[in-house]
């Protein structure tokens, strides 16, 4: 009771300080509670999945480390996810990849059906979660010569076209069963290691293959598709078919969401600067919040400048309504549940920081060229008691405050993870 009283006292002081500059903390907390983060399942097992967990991870990505306790079964993964969600304020979504089938049947990617994901749906209902989806265009023998949908081999293309079509039905099933729109994100790692002669033809093949995948009209109440670009991957350093320009053109002309992954661009290029432009011309955005360290390394999201800027862009420009926020990182050198908790809570914190700005006043100052006041206030805000508002948010949502969550993760590691 003592800690609760202290948290509440500190919040009341913070509330008054923010009120003095025209910020309503109660409104900010209500807005934050309604924002769902799509937490990715693949942090829990280092992107192995359950279709062929002993196979090679391909597609130009890499999970490094060998921290004990990775999930080996759907049941273990769900158990770990439940622990993570219990430490994160609010109700959210889970982002599944197609390789995370939960079935006793022997199925391939071009054979998957909604029934192979029914245990995930039943679990999501119990937990009050939504489900997003991703077809898996990697870690499979039909990922041939670094190509899937853009392959010159029709047999390879047809296999992956069928996989894409089936993934749409699964995403639709999620939306119908759970009453939340399921975002189905298409990332295709096709590319070439060294400089190609023909950049045009593979892109034409990819465009035509995607058109075939998306030919059937599905109700967007249940599922919406996003398309995700990438600059390069391991083994595809010189050329990736699905570049930013390709998918921006494809998404805008085909009425698809544009997925921006924080690690899929040049090292000095940031996705925060792209959001306002995409908001003007595209249907909407799917975010993969990640942290690239010199390349698309998929480090756990920390409270760095870019994460703060992403939050600001979404809030300042009123883009939350057209943005689906997902996470994409996988670090096998640390406790995987801690990775989820740190990344998700940090993403929420970045949004709260932005929600606690006097945005309308700052915009007015900027419009009137009062850059002095703009600078003074934004700098002073850095010393405002944001942490007290965040702690109160955790408290009223029934999750651990401060580092208390780490104690629970350590205990879970001792009781569960180290016994696997």
Curated annotation (Swiss-Prot):
InterPro entries: L-rhamnose_isomerase, Rhamnose_isomerase, Xyl_isomerase-like_sf. GO terms for cellular component: cytoplasm. The keyword Metal-binding applies. GO terms for biological process: L-lyxose metabolic process; rhamnose catabolic process. It is an enzyme of class 5 (isomerase). It holds the Pfam family RhaA. Its main location: cytoplasm. SUPFAM superfamilies: Xylose isomerase-like (SSF51658). Binds 1 Mn(2+) ion per subunit. Disulfide bonds: none annotated. It is found in: Cytoplasm. It comes from the Bacteria. Keywords: Cytoplasm, Isomerase, Manganese, Metal-binding, Rhamnose metabolism. GO terms for molecular function: L-rhamnose isomerase activity; manganese ion binding. Mn(2+) binds at residues 264, 296, 298. It catalyses: L-rhamnopyranose = L-rhamnulose. Its cofactor is Mn(2+). Pathway: Carbohydrate degradation; L-rhamnose degradation; glycerone phosphate from L-rhamnose: step 1/3. The keyword Cell inner membrane does not apply. Its EC number is 5.3.1.14. PANTHER family: L-RHAMNOSE ISOMERASE. Catalyzes the interconversion of L-rhamnose and L-rhamnulose. Belongs to the rhamnose isomerase family. This is L-rhamnose isomerase. It comes from Listeria monocytogenes serovar 1/2a (strain ATCC BAA-679 / EGD-e).
